[in-house]
Amino acid sequence: MKTSIHPNYNDVQIICSCGNTFKTRSTIDKKELHLDVCSSCHPFYTGKQKIMDSAGRVEKFKSRYASFKR
């Protein structure tokens, strides 16, 4: 492996807007990285995800195909 062509691999403190912090390693030159969303507060990971049904498309689909037999 060639020397001096690879980026430095530094310790980085990740800070989320929810207050969660953890330490990882990265090639960025900063000591801290501020995030808006992490796995502790993201709706997909917390189970609080909402499914948006715009204009009743699910109901329209169900009513259209309700008469078909399986």
From Swiss-Prot:
PROSITE patterns: RIBOSOMAL_L31. The keyword Signal does not apply. Binds 1 zinc ion per subunit. One of its GO terms (molecular function) is structural constituent of ribosome. Its cofactor is Zn(2+). Zn(2+) binds at residues 16, 18, 38, 41. GO terms for biological process: translation. Coiled coil: none annotated. Keywords: Metal-binding, Ribonucleoprotein, Ribosomal protein, RNA-binding, rRNA-binding, Zinc. Pfam families: Ribosomal_L31 (PF01197). One of its GO terms (cellular component) is ribosome. Signal peptide: none annotated. Belongs to the bacterial ribosomal protein bL31 family. Type A subfamily. Part of the 50S ribosomal subunit. Binds the 23S rRNA. This is Large ribosomal subunit protein bL31. It comes from Vesicomyosocius okutanii subsp. Calyptogena okutanii (strain HA). The gene is rpmE.
